[in-house]
Regions:
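Membrane-interface transmembrane helices that cradle and orient dolichyl/undecaprenyl
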Residues: 139-152, 184, 338
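Membrane-interface alpha helices of multi-pass inner-membrane proteins
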Residues: 151-176, 307
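Aromatic- and kink-enriched transmembrane "portal" helix at the membrane-lumen/periplasm boundary
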Residues: 60, 110-138
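Membrane-water interface signatures at transmembrane helix termini and the short loops
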Residues: 121-132, 266-271, 278-335
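Perimembrane helix-loop-helix junctions
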Residues: 171-199
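Short hydrophobic/aromatic helix or loop-helix immediately within or flanking a transmembrane segment
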Residues: 53-87
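Transmembrane-helix signature of polytopic, membrane-embedded enzymes
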Residues: 97-119, 293
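Transmembrane-helix motifs of polytopic, lipid-linked glycan transferases
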Residues: 84-107, 142, 282-283
């Protein structure tokens, strides 16, 4: 009888995450029904740019690996290659989460639903295309859930920063999970297991800051990218990626800060309040069984830290989703250790799944799928 119950709960867990993958991939393939068509995927440069073309520069690792392995040229149309790569990435990310839930016997129905169908995690990644966020999440998930060795931990931190510098904003969550919730690791400032990850992270940041700038003109850069992206050429204002890999942090800070302040003044910031409320609920869920003030402080800090990306980049819902994702991943880590899957917050978190996915850019589109349906059939 007990074995039958366990078998059924495992099957249910499997079906929940398979459904999440299918739902996310359906959103990924929105090009079939939207007026934008394949352009709904957004930018492709980050999957096709390579060190072999321009030398070392920031945000070039993923594109280099995909270019050298020729995975990004599996299809003659680069948009289909991008869709394929993104679908595989969704599958990998979801499989890692599902495996962790299965291994740690996390099978509370409402809790798992709140994870699998969160508007910020698996489903959101079906909509959040044209960037490197999903690769950042995969590295973060591996470090938070599975890594116990500080050498491997450090290596993944280094790789993550090379993927995209916004990975830096997930570091507090990863350090929290590694040192405070792995029994084999204790945070000792002068211990080699602490010093090496910190030095590795700082080294990657320094390398990006001082050696990650392009040494090529915009015209030469775009000539190369035009050959790589014939179908995406001039289809997006930022189609080539030159702006993203060449602009300074100071310029990004100035533009992004002004952008957010403008939308606070015009009232559009109100659209972001419900997604921010969701993050608040996740914080309450994550901290509910923690009685250590120190751990609560660091946990809340780790969850909220990704919101600071808004000061250097404009895509407000991406950063809210990243913050929510750190909350979800750390909650899973905490629950796996404590065994407390039940919570009064589970039902509210599950209800929020009805809003999936969150948007990416633009204050006025917090729930793009719902808004698309309303605009398509009712307005």
């Amino acid at each position: 009888m007990i074995n039958a119950v366990r078998k059924n709960s495992s099957l249910l867990l499997f079906l929940i995450f398979i459904s999440a993958i299918l739902y996310s991939c359906a959103i990924l393939n929105r090009w079939i029904v939207t007026d934008l068509g394949l352009l709904s995927y957004n930018r492709l440069w980050q999957l096709n740019i390579s060190y072999t073309d321009f030398g070392f520069f920031r945000r070039g690792l993923v594109g280099t690996l995909l270019s050298e392995s020729r995975i990004n040229s599996l299809f003659s149309n680069e948009y289909f290659s991008a869709l394929f790569i993104h679908a595989i990435s969704i599958f990998i990310m979801t499989s890692l989460i599902a495996y962790y839930c299965f291994r740690k016997n996390i099978k509370n129905f409402l809790f798992v639903i709140g994870i699998a169908f969160s508007p910020a995690l698996i489903i959101h990644q079906g909509y959040n295309t044209g960037n490197l966020d999903i690769f950042i999440l995969i590295i973060s998930i591996i470090n938070i859930f599975f890594v116990r060795n500080y050498i491997i931990f450090s290596l993944l931190l280094f790789i993550g920063v090379l993927i995209h510098e916004i990975f830096i904003f997930t570091l507090p969550a990863q350090f929290f999970a590694f040192y405070l919730y792995n029994r084999s690791n204790k945070l000792k400032i002068l211990d080699v297991a602490t010093i090496i990850p910190v030095i590795t992270s700082l080294s990657a940041i320094v390398i990006i800051l001082f050696f990650g700038k392009l040494d090529i003109s915009e015209l030469e850069f775009k000539d190369v990218m035009q050959n790589k992206l014939p179908n995406a050429y001039m289809k997006h204002i930022l189609w080539s990626g030159f702006y993203e890999v060449s602009t300074s942090g100071q310029l990004n800070l100035s533009l992004s800060t002004q952008y957010h302040f403008d939308h606070i003044k015009d009232g559009r910031f109100i659209y972001a309040l419900l997604p921010l409320f969701y993050v608040g609920i996740l914080i309450l869920r994550a901290t509910q069984n923690n009685h250590s003030r120190r751990e609560v402080f660091f946990l809340v800090f780790a969850i909220l830290f990704p919101l600071l990306i808004a000061f250097v980049a404009m895509d407000i819902y991406r950063w809210i989703a990243m913050s929510a994702n750190m909350a979800l991943l750390l909650t899973l880590k905490i629950v796996a250790k404590s065994g407390h899957t039940y919570s009064k917050w589970n039902i509210l978190i599950a209800i929020f799944c009805l809003l999936a996915p969150f948007g990416a850019a633009g204050y006025a589109r917090p729930f793009p799928m719902h808004q698309f349906v309303l605009e398509k059939f009712f307005f």
